[in-house]
């Protein structure tokens, strides 16, 4: 009479686990280690659920974890799997928070240096402090030197073109305007010059 009572205890205990733990609802009534294999399969299917269901399952696993691990060896898989689920949820949260490639583009637009080049520049500065800057400097420097030479050549040609030409008559008045202290002297000098050019022989 003692032998038929023992098999009835294991299914009752398994039924109690099925009612309490939602993650172990798919447990079979096989004896030995077979009844924990479906539990592992159901645990690997947890990431397919929605985040709200994962949070509920994780809360129940946290509440029932210590009591189950003390009695039976099967639920030892729950803490590690729980950590992996939390890690996956963290990844999903970071991806949704940053917004994928668009957030990377906005960050590279607003920030002066991308995240990867800062580390590379730090390594280059440790090896040789001026190498990272001198790589990009010479092309700009050469272009600036070429541009300066062209400007000097054009300005020299522009100034040389006026050397053979006669000086304009208004150049004297321009110098007098700079040196004179008032408009009266400018008007008098201009009036005297015009009278002299008019052919007044007594003045000459």
Curated annotation (Swiss-Prot):
- Keywords per UniProt: Apoptosis, Cytoplasm, Membrane, Methylation, Mitochondrion, Mitochondrion outer membrane, Phosphoprotein
Is Mitochondrion one of the keywords UniProt gives this record? yes
UniProt's post-translational modification comment states:
Phosphorylated on one or more of Ser-112, Ser-136, Ser-155 and Ser-170 in response to survival stimuli, which blocks its pro-apoptotic activity. Phosphorylation on Ser-136 or Ser-112 promotes heterodimerization with 14-3-3 proteins. This interaction then facilitates the phosphorylation at Ser-155, a site within the BH3 motif, leading to the release of Bcl-X(L) and the promotion of cell survival. Ser-136 is the major site of AKT/PKB phosphorylation, Ser-155 the major site of protein kinase A (CAPK) phosphorylation.
Localization terms from the record: Mitochondrion outer membrane; Cytoplasm
InterPro entries of this UniProt entry? Answer: BAD (IPR018868)
Q: What is its main location?
A: mitochondrion
- List Phosphoserine occurrences by residue: 67, 112, 128, 134, 136, 155, 170
UniProt free text on domains: Intact BH3 motif is required by BIK, BID, BAK, BAD and BAX for their pro-apoptotic activity and for their interaction with anti-apoptotic members of the Bcl-2 family.
Whom does it interact with, and what assembly results?
Forms heterodimers with the anti-apoptotic proteins, Bcl-X(L), Bcl-2 and Bcl-W. Also binds protein S100A10. The Ser-112/Ser-136 phosphorylated form binds 14-3-3 proteins. Interacts with AKT1 and PIM3. Interacts (via BH3 domain) with NOL3 (via CARD domain); preventing the association of BAD with BCL2. Interacts with HIF3A isoform 2 (via C-terminus domain); the interaction reduces the binding between BAD and BAX. Interacts with GIMAP3/IAN4 and GIMAP5/IAN5.
- Function according to Swiss-Prot or TrEMBL: Promotes cell death. Successfully competes for the binding to Bcl-X(L), Bcl-2 and Bcl-W, thereby affecting the level of heterodimerization of these proteins with BAX. Can reverse the death repressor activity of Bcl-X(L), but not that of Bcl-2. Appears to act as a link between growth factor receptor signaling and the apoptotic pathways.
Q: What PANTHER family does this protein map onto? A: BCL2-ASSOCIATED AGONIST OF CELL DEATH
Name it: Bcl2-associated agonist of cell death
Native source organism of the sequence: Mus musculus (Mouse)
